[in-house]
């Protein structure tokens, strides 16, 4: 059975791409009456506030018609930012050699929170170098992953 997030992703790809952007990813966070649907959009030319507003209007219309979420929620549309969340194997592969932080569902090497360098991606497996050790992590074990920005 498809998750709500995967259904939402399939529903929102076309309207986001119709406006010339790509759907980087999304998160649906349930918090009682304060649930939030975060939609991240990207574009090789960057994302501006007007882009977020345009996409928000477009996908709000789709969400109003399709009504995939039965409870009240807040819609947030933004760029992934410098500490961008990572959702897919392709996104991790794009940042080979970069530092990421991951929160895991099940511990790996005794920890659910890891910070390391992306050493490789093969299929749905991420190789992360943490303190000189290579750890292989299934992408479906990653609850949340973020790029660590360099300054």
Curated annotation (Swiss-Prot):
Respond yes or no to whether keyword Acetylation is given for this record: no
User: Mind telling me which SUPFAM superfamilies this protein's record contains?
Assistant: YhbC-like, C-terminal domain, YhbC-like, N-terminal domain
Alphabetically sorted, this entry's keywords are: Cytoplasm, Ribosome biogenesis
Q: Which GO terms describe its biological process?
A: ribosomal small subunit assembly; translation
Major subcellular site: cytoplasm
GO cellular component assignments: cytosol
> Gene3D superfamilies of this UniProt entry?
Ribosome maturation factor RimP, C-terminal domain (2.30.30.180), RimP-like superfamily, N-terminal (3.30.300.70)
Q: Where in the cell is it found?
A: Cytoplasm
| CDD domains in the record | YlxS_C (cd01734)
The protein's matches in Pfam families, at most eight in alphabetical order, are given as: DUF150_C (PF17384), RimP_N (PF02576)
So which domain of life are we looking at? Bacteria
Family to which this protein belongs:
Belongs to the RimP family.
The protein's role, per its UniProt record: Required for maturation of 30S ribosomal subunits.
Q: What is this protein called?
A: Ribosome maturation factor RimP
Q: What's the source species for this entry? A: Shewanella loihica (strain ATCC BAA-1088 / PV-4)
Q: What is the lineage of its organism?
A: Bacteria, Pseudomonadati, Pseudomonadota, Gammaproteobacteria, Alteromonadales
């Amino acid at each position: 059975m498809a998750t709500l997030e995967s259904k939402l992703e399939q529903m929102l790809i076309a309207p986001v791409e119709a406006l010339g952007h790509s759907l980087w990813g999304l998160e649906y966070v349930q918090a009682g009456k304060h649930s939030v649907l975060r939609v991240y959009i990207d574009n090789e030319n960057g994302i501006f506030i007007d882009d977020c507003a345009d996409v928000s209007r477009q996908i709000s219309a789709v969400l109003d018609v399709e009504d995939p979420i039965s409870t009240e929620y807040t819609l947030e549309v933004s760029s992934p930012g410098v500490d961008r969340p990572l959702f897919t194997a392709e996104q991790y592969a794009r940042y080979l050699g970069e530092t990421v932080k991951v929160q895991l569902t099940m511990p790996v090497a005794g920890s659910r929170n890891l910070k390391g360098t992306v050493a490789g991606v093969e299929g749905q497996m991420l190789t992360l170098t943490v303190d000189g050790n290579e750890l292989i992590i299934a992408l479906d074990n990653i609850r949340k992953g973020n790029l660590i920005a360099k300054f």
